[in-house]
Structures are given as C-alpha cells and as structure tokens.
C-alpha cells in the first residue's frame, strides 16, 4: 500500500441548531444571520483505496503532505521522522499524524487505541458540556437527561 495523494479541502454549512444561542455570542444577529460553519479537512489517499481523514489543514499541510506521496503509511515512524525534519510547525505535523493513524487503523481494522498499546483502564467517567446549548431551563434539563441516558 502506498500513499497516492494528500488533499486539503473545506466544507461549509449552516450553523448547527443550538450553537450561538446566547445573544452575546451572536452580537445581536438572528441565528440565520450567523456566519456559516466552515471546517477544513485533510484526506490521505492510498492505492489500496483506504483513506485517512482528519480535521484541520492549511497550505503548510498541503505542501508537507506532498512529501508523503509514494510512501508506505504503515512505516509510520520513518514517515514521522521525515516530516519532522521538514517542518517544526506542530499544527501541520498534528494534522498529518492524525490522518496517518486513521489510515493505519482502517488498514489494520483496529481502533487507534489498540494500535497505541491498548486501553490503559477499563472505563472512564463521561463528561458532557452544554455551553451554548440553550438558555431555556426546560430545554437544558431535557438535554441533561438525554446526556445521562447515553
């Protein structure tokens, strides 16, 4: 398996409901007037049809990603050393690092936590933030119950 392309692209859509509900966050705008949500992604493609997808990307990621073309993504340590020699931009390294781990996990049909050595503990406490969800007490209470049930 070899890396054939690294693409950086942006998706745009309307804000999700529940975001920017607080007047101070919107600056007096109605929810319809709030700027559309934009997010950049990076996708690492291979000749085997397996792709690694991660959030984030930039012109630096795009340029650095071109050095991955032709590489075997399973040779992670060698690739990481090459990337580190080419840049000290931690954001660009992080984006490509996450994309490579996603790709390796898909190729091996293993979750990333297992590739990194397995679980450290059997369970963790869940945390659910509700910042920006709703100022209505009943809606917040309903959402709190939903979070507890999950």
Located regions from the model:
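Conserved structural scaffold segments of CAZyme catalytic domains across common CAZy folds
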Residues: 98-100, 110-114, 121, 139, ...
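N-terminal small/glycine-rich loop or linker at the start of catalytic domains
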Residues: 108-132
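Glycine-rich, charged/polar anion/phosphate-binding loops
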Residues: 26-29, 112, 141-142
């Amino acid at each position: 398996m070899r890396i054939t392309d690294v693409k950086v692209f942006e998706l745009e859509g309307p804000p999700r409901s529940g975001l920017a509900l607080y007047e101070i966050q919107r600056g007096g705008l109605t929810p319809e007037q709030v700027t559309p949500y934009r997010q950049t992604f990076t996708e690492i493609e291979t000749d085997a049809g397996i792709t690694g997808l991660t959030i984030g990307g930039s012109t630096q990621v795009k340029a650095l990603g071109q050095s991955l073309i032709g590489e075997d993504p399973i040779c992670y340590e060698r690739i990481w050393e090459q990337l580190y020699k080419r840049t000290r931009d931690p954001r660009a390294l992080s984006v490509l690092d996450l994309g490579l781990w996603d790709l390796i996990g898909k190729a091996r049909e293993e979750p990333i936590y297992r590739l990194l050595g397995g679980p450290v503990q059997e369970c963790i406490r869940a945390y659910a933030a509700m910042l920006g969800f709703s100022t209505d007490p009943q809606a917040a209470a309903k959402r709190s119950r939903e979070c507890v049930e999950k």
